[in-house]
Amino acid sequence: LSRKLNRKQQAVNLLLSLRQPHVNEWKKKVYNYIDNHADGEITQLPIEEIDKILGFYEFISIAVMNGTADEEIIKESQRYVYIRLYEGLRDYIDKVQKDEVSIYCHFSEHAKKWNYHRKMPSFVRND
């Protein structure tokens, strides 16, 4: 029981850390890029913010994978974010994984795992 409560508490702590102003700024810049890119606009890739936000979600994914954080809590609150980031940044993720296959691999796995048979928003590629 204690371990289960610890996993839930760790998940809550991770979710609270996502509310920090600097994390929200990273996410805002990345979402703006994703939205503009989906509309066909050519915009500069905010690489620093993308790497920071994907790195943050990779850390959360590792915590879920190794049982430190409760998967259901993370999935219920962040599933859409995982899918949106993964689908919106798939070209970038694929590019960096060509050089280093393990980069963002846990994040990518959770995004794919949690994206089960649901209608995706218009910004998502269908290939």
Task: Give a label for each model feature.
Residues L1-A38:
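Membrane-proximal alpha-helical anchors
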Residues G40-I42:
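Short, positively charged
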Residues Q44-D127:
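An amphipathic alpha-helical interaction surface
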